[in-house]
Amino acid sequence: MTKGILGKKVGMTQIFTESGEFIPVTVIEATPNVVLQVKTVETDGYEAVQVGFDDKREVLSNKPAKGHVAKANTAPKRFIREFKNIEGLEVGAELSVEQFEAGDVVDVTGTSKGKGFQGVIKRHGQSRGPMAHGSRYHRRPGSMGPVAPNRVFKNKRLAGRMGGNRVTVQNLEIVQVIPEKNVILIKGNVPGAKKSLITIKSAVKAAK
């Protein structure tokens, strides 16, 4: 069965194992998620569990949103997402960090940091041109393609806005779970800025 929870990225730190091994970790604060709706094939066409995370003031919610969360006897939520392959939950149930254990392998999804308008060297990792005095270009994108089509093909790697994309990093290891603080420590880095929404769920491609 799939495990899943929504959380907020706090930042990065480091811990040491009993043997003295140094491990960089990302701190994820995941307060209990509330099950707002259980979707079924009969009513919705597919099976999923809808959960809400991070309370918000009622004045910021409209009437339909208030009625939706009222079925679960909870406050309006800032973030609402769905998880598939989660069974045995009812509306109003809570998902906490206690479902995870140290050593679990998970996939982490977040929104990458926005970098603004960037050139091809930073955005796509292309090499720069010669920096000599006679060089015709230094940081430009280079050839636009052959003459014959009289146009630039789609998906040509050019300058543009970088970052702000939905990114999933697979097969990250949970190093430690601290239930009393609703905190999960994940080995390595995860996408997103501090205080951004993070989705944690069981790894799809984990070694069995």
Curated annotation (Swiss-Prot):
InterPro entries per UniProt: Ribosomal_uL3 (IPR000597), Ribosomal_uL3_bac/org-type (IPR019927), Ribosomal_uL3_CS (IPR019926), Transl_B-barrel_sf (IPR009000)
Keywords: Ribonucleoprotein, Ribosomal protein, RNA-binding, rRNA-binding
Region ranges (Disordered): 116-148
GO terms for cellular component: cytosolic large ribosomal subunit
Keyword presence, Transcription: no
Ribosomal protein listed as a keyword: yes
GO annotation terms (biological process): translation
Any matching Pfam family: Ribosomal_L3
Assembly mode: Part of the 50S ribosomal subunit. Forms a cluster with proteins L14 and L19.
PANTHER family noted in UniProt: 50S RIBOSOMAL PROTEIN L3 (PTHR11229), LARGE RIBOSOMAL SUBUNIT PROTEIN UL3C (PTHR11229:SF16)
Record family assignment: Belongs to the universal ribosomal protein uL3 family.
NCBIfam families: L3_bact
Name of the protein in question: Large ribosomal subunit protein uL3
Native source species: Streptococcus pyogenes serotype M49 (strain NZ131)
Lineage: Bacteria, Bacillati, Bacillota, Bacilli, Lactobacillales
